[in-house]
């Protein structure tokens, strides 16, 4: 708006000069005016375009936050029977966290339709609001790699040796669990194996490990927990290899970073398409 005002003032002044000059010089002045006016418009237009592109790029960087694998971490049933690995203390800085207490933020889907990072500050109020019911799915909620690839399979039971239980191979796995106030929308779910979501069905594996830890702590203490869940992809694959979760309570009693593997014993996953095969 300021640039437009400047442009208008310049035009008025130049017109005044033009009409106050003698006729012979007016023709020359007119062409000078025309050229200068056109150049001025171009200059301001170019400046405005540069500013627009800068803001657009800044917003893109802020809102689309899919992460690629930096260092391959291999899963095996002996070392990681519950499908998660501790990475030490969290990376969370309270002063730099993008949301406030009781708020949630989900990245926009990237150009491949992949889910990005989710942030939330889990409060006792949000936990109580979510207790005893599940939020209905809203709109198109199938994450990248999910559609057409899911079917029921048999998994080894963690409760009875030699026994199996039947379940869907893939879940629409929440980045921020609905029990923690997370929304049932596409930007908050990834295509995750049953094991990535709940481990071996024993409430201490997969995403449930850190989710239950945070849930129980908030219920017990009433303290807020800062929570960040980040799906990690390799190159242009559309199913994440794993999810990295950072959780830190406001009193520092919970301060943890975990890697949750997106795989399943006895199966091979094509992360480029979401198809899977029994070994």
Q: Where are the predicted features?
A:
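Compositionally biased, low-structure terminal segments
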Residues: 5, 20, 31-34, 38, ...
């Amino acid at each position: 708006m300021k640039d437009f005002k400047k442009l208008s003032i310049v035009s008025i002044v130049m017109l005044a000069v033009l009409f106050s000059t003698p006729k012979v010089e007016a023709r020359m002045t007119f062409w000078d005016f025309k050229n200068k006016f056109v150049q001025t418009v171009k200059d301001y237009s170019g400046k405005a375009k540069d500013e627009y592109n800068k803001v657009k790029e800044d917003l893109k960087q802020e809102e689309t936050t899919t992460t690629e694998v930096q260092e391959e971490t291999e899963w095996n049933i002996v070392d990681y029977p519950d499908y998660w690995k501790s990475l030490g203390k969290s990376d969370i800085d309270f002063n730099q966290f993008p949301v406030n207490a009781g708020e949630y933020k989900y990245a926009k889907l990237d150009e491949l339709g992949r889910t990005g990072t989710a942030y939330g500050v889990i409060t006792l109020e949000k936990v109580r609001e979510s207790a005893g019911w599940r939020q209905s799915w809203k709109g198109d909620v199938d994450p990248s790699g999910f559609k057409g690839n899911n079917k029921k399979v048999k998994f080894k039971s963690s409760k009875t040796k030699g026994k199996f239980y039947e379940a869907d191979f893939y879940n629409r796995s929440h980045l921020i669990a609905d029990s923690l106030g997370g929304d049932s929308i596409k930007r908050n779910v990834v295509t995750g194996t049953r094991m990535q979501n709940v481990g071996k069905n024993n409430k201490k594996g997969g995403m449930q490990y850190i989710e239950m830890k945070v849930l129980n702590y908030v219920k017990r203490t009433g303290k807020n927990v800062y929570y960040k869940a980040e799906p990690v992809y390799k190159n242009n694959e559309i199913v994440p290899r794993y999810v990295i979760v950072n959780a830190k309570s406001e009193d520092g009693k919970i301060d943890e970073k975990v890697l949750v593997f997106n795989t399943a014993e006895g199966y091979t996953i094509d992360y480029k398409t979401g198809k899977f095969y029994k070994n």
